[in-house]
Amino acid sequence: MGCTGGWVAKVITDIAGSSAWFERGFVTYSNEAKAQMIGVREETLAQHGAVSEPVVVEMAIGALKAARADYAVSISGIAGPDGGSEEKPVGTVWFAFATARGEGITRRECFSGDRDAVRRQATAYALQTLWQQFLQNT
C-alpha cells in the first residue's frame, strides 16, 4: 500500500475481533518492496511510475496471491508535501480493488489538504469503496 503507510490495516485492526477475518496487509512503500513482496513487475514501475493504474492493479493481484485472500485493496499516491507534478499533483491517489473471484475495479482520486489529510481521506475512501462495491451485499 502506497501513501497510507498501512493505515487501512490499522483501521481494520482497530475493530475488536478483526483477527477472525483479517490476516495481513502489505506496506510496500518503495518500488523494491512492491516488486519483492507482491510481484509488481519492474517494467510496469519503470514505464508508468508507482502512482499509476497499472501498478495498483498489479499490487492488488499480487496481494491476493501472496495472502491467498478473498479481497485486496491497493493504494499508491502522492500525499505530499513534495513529489507532485503537473500530471500527478500532490493529493493524487490510485486505488485498485480485486477479489479472488476475478472481479476488480480501479479508481483515481485527487484529495486536498496536507499530508495527513490526504492519507486519512485515502484510507476512508478505500474502506468505503471496498464496503460499497464488494461487501455490503454479501
Predicted regions and their residues:
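Short alpha-helical segments enriched in small residues
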Residues: G2-T138
